[in-house]
Regions:
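A short glycine-rich, Lys/Arg-flanked "PGG" loop and its adjoining helix->strand segment in the class I
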Residues: 126-138
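Conserved alpha-helix/loop element of class I SAM-dependent methyltransferases that forms part
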Residues: 28-45
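Conserved beta-strand signature within the Rossmann-like core of class I S-adenosyl-L-methionine
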Residues: 140-147
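Core SAM-dependent methyltransferase catalytic element
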Residues: 180-192
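A short SAM/SAH-binding and catalytic strip from SAM-dependent methyltransferases
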Residues: 112-124
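Class I SAM-dependent methyltransferase Rossmann-like catalytic core
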Residues: 14-31
């Protein structure tokens, strides 16, 4: 049980050798989910993008390749993750250690917010979504994607689409659509 608890903690905030190894494993496991999810974005241009829970930044690189004209900031609470991500050098791509509950971004400054395989780890789901709503532009999009079974383990109270829809409405968001592919689910969310 101690090992399981340690692995759960590493998935929330990777650190040290184990955290670095897990991030490499996640790249293999979750980058295909990222590629699938971004196909559901409606626009071909998002000037300012925030990628939440970036790990070592590999998904953020794919975002930059998909939207080369965008300014993209990747955030994570893990010092280890951000140290690895900062090794990536691309124009208009930045990585910062920040908490999703208090990003420090200006009101309505982001066109697209993405979070892949991470929102079920946020310490305060309501505060996190309220912060994302604050920084998202009125015509912006929030795209979440994750393994569906993680929701039943970490967020059983909002696992059903209807419960998640109600939760989003309570924090000023609207669920536009959800899509499933095998074990994955994505949510397209806008301000209401």
């Amino acid at each position: 049980m101690l090992l399981f608890s340690r692995l759960i903690q590493q998935s929330k905030n990777p650190s040290g050798f184990l955290g670095k190894r897990m991030m490499k494993l996640w790249n293999r496991a979750y980058l295909p989910m990222f590629v699938w999810a971004i196909r559901y974005l409606d626009r071909t241009s998002y000037p300012a993008i925030l990628d939440v829970g970036v790990g070592n930044g590999r998904s953020t690189i794919l975002l930059k390749k998909t939207f080369p004209q965008s300014t993209i900031t990747g955030i994570d609470i893990s010092d280890t993750a951000i140290a690895q991500a900062k090794q990536i050098e691309m124009t208009n791509l930045n990585f910062e250690r920040r908490d999703v509950r208090e990003t420090g971004f200006s009101d309505e400054s982001v066109d697209l917010i993405t979070a892949f395989q991470t929102h079920f780890h946020w310490q305060d789901l309501e505060a996190s979504f309220m912060e994302l709503r604050r920084i998202l532009k009125s015509d912006g999009m929030l795209l979440l994607a994750c393994e569906y079974n993680k929701l039943s383990y970490f967020l059983p109270e909002v696992q059903s689409e209807e419960a998640f829809r109600r939760f989003l409405l309570s924090v000023g968001f609207e669920l536009i659509t959800s899509q499933r592919k095998g074990a994955w689910i994505l949510y397209k969310i806008v301000k209401n």
